[in-house]
């Protein structure tokens, strides 16, 4: 019989992460690269691992991630969201803890669009009195 495979989609800013949890030793692979090779900053690794640490499943699942779009911070947030959703498929008892920590909520904050007449979303051209 095939091993159990749990799936979750995570989104943050313009990043989308497809996350698969497979029973294993706790290895995290992002876009066919090790997490340490993919994320340079330690804080990004911590953000991505938060749901596994919270539910104490860091050494019970191997995490396979395919992520695209956005920057590293958005991708780390998308991975966290995806892992949280996949953990719910694995065991629904994790829901209260994940919900309380805010890992199941899709962060709706997006980049504000640039407006005409302005240099950026809100940045106006320099004002000259004379």
UniProtKB/Swiss-Prot annotation:
Pfam families, per the entry: Ribosomal_S9 (PF00380)
Keywords linked to the UniProt accession: Ribonucleoprotein, Ribosomal protein
GO aspect biological process, one term: translation
GO-annotated molecular function: RNA binding; structural constituent of ribosome
Domain of life: Bacteria
A GO cellular component annotation in the UniProt record: cytosolic small ribosomal subunit
Residue spans of biased composition, Basic residues class: 111-130
Region ranges (Disordered): 109-130
Family designation: Belongs to the universal ribosomal protein uS9 family.
Cited PANTHER family: RIBOSOMAL PROTEIN S9, SMALL RIBOSOMAL SUBUNIT PROTEIN US9M
Protein name per the record: Small ribosomal subunit protein uS9
Organism annotation: Lachnoclostridium phytofermentans (strain ATCC 700394 / DSM 18823 / ISDg)
Gene (UniProt): rpsI
């Amino acid at each position: 019989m095939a091993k159990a495979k749990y799936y979750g989609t995570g989104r943050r800013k313009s990043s989308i992460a497809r996350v698969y949890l497979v029973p294993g030793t706790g290895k995290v692979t992002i876009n066919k690269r090790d997490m340490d090779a993919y994320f340079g900053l330690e804080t990004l690794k911590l953000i991505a691992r938060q749901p596994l640490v919270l539910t104490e499943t860091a050494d019970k699942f191997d995490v396979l991630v395919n992520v695209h779009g956005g920057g590293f911070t958005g991708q780390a947030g998308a991975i966290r969201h995806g892992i949280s959703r996949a953990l719910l498929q694995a065991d629904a008892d994790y829901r209260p803890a994940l919900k309380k920590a805010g890992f199941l909520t899709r962060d709706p904050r997006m980049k504000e669009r640039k407006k005409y007449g302005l240099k950026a979303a809100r940045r106006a051209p320099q004002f000259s009195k004379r």
